[in-house]
């Protein structure tokens, strides 16, 4: 039997990560310590790449059984492909790296926005040089971008004001976010995204038979997936996501730690975003190559809104709960309010706002808008890379 590329990637990644984890558990050190983090990085990426594809195939099978449109099926596939990143963040939070998890989640939004802008350049255009965006993005996705940009701006400015200005009597407000605040903010984001999923599935999710609108049709070639096969795929995907996430979180400790690469925290987060996001970028490119434009577009767009509302929301909830259970913190002073934690949250505002503006003006996107977005994101990336190391 010939293995698919994702299966080969999964097997190789598992063959690298599992022995490393076993040796660490047993306290054995046969491999030089300076080589182990790089093996964890390579194995984690390959394992997560295979896990992402297994999750996507599972969701595509379910979508076929439920007669979902290509775009909405792609949204659920994109959500599934973020599960490995949730494991990465979970292991970072378990290790007490609350700020690293916060920065990693926000840096992912920024990098995925750049990917969406670049991908919008290669979308097939009509005779006027425009690509008509699905109604789900125009009518519902734009609302989500509006809410996300307002939330990021208001919370970011509030954190900055708390950090800069004293209260009456010159006493400073505690310059940390506590467990209760993180849990509250996180639940608010998750609730908004659940409402988004409900609306987009109910009104844009079902295939309309014999329709002339390609956005309400389905061209995905996937077979119905029996429950036992679905269970196997989900188990394989979850196992790979957990092991790969643990491996990448270990590399994150190495990249930002004084005994490792000792990179500034923003540089380490951006490095991890590039490596950890590679599987999702491959999914976008692969779907486009197979002419599954709606699936590729939903993955690219979902990499922005889903990361902010799901991954960032999960990060805050998990940090709040585990910080409360931490005997050293007891729910207090979990996340420091400082430059790095604030700047990326504020940067999420122009990132999502410019996307929202480009989408809502005429429900179309052209090369001028794509180049404009890319230019803005490159300037922001330069600021992060240059000033993030100060």
Where are these regions (language model features)?
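Hydrophobic alpha-helical segments, chiefly the membrane-spanning helices
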Residues: 1-390
């Amino acid at each position: 039997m010939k293995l698919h590329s994702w299966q080969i990637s999964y097997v190789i990644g598992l063959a690298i990560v599992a022995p490393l984890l076993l040796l660490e558990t047993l306290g054995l050190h046969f491999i030089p310590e300076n080589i182990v983090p790089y093996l964890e990085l390579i194995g984690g990426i390959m394992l997560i790449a295979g896990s992402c594809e297994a999750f996507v195939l599972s969701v595509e099978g379910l979508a076929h059984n439920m007669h979902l449109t290509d775009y909405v099926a792609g949204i659920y596939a994109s959500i599934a492909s973020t599960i490995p990143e949730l494991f990465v963040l979970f292991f970072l939070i378990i290790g007490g790296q609350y700020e690293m998890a916060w920065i990693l989640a926000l840096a992912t939004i920024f990098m995925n926005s750049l990917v969406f802008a670049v991908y919008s350049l290669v979308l097939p255009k009509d005779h006027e040089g425009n690509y008509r965006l699905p109604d789900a993005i125009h009518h519902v996705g734009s609302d989500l971008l509006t809410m996300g940009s307002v939330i990021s701006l208001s919370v970011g400015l509030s954190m900055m004001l708390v950090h800069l200005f004293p209260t009456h009597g010159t006493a400073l407000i505690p310059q940390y976010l506590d467990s209760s605040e993180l849990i509250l903010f996180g639940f608010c984001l998750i609730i908004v995204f659940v409402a988004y999923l409900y609306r987009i599935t109910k009104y844009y999710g079902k295939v309309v038979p014999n329709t002339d609108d390609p956005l309400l049709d389905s061209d995905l070639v996937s077979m119905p997936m029996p429950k036992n096969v679905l269970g196997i795929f989900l188990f394989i995907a979850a196992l790979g996501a957990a092991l790969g996430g643990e491996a990448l979180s270990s590399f994150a400790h190495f990249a930002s730690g004084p005994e490792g690469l000792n990179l500034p925290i923003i540089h380490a987060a951006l490095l991890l975003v590039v490596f950890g996001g590679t599987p999702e970028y491959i999914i976008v490119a692969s779907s486009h190559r197979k002419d599954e434009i709606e699936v590729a577009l939903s993955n690219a767009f979902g990499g922005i809104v889903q990361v902010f509302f799901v991954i960032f929301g999960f990060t805050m909830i998990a940090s709040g709960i585990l910080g409360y259970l931490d005997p050293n913190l007891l729910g207090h002073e979990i996340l420091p309010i400082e430059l790095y934690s604030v700047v990326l949250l504020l940067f999420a505002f122009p990132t999502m706002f410019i996307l929202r503006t480009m989408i809502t003006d005429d429900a179309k996107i052209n090369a001028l808008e794509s180049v404009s977005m890319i230019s803005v994101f490159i300037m922001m990336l330069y600021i992060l890379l240059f000033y993030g190391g100060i």
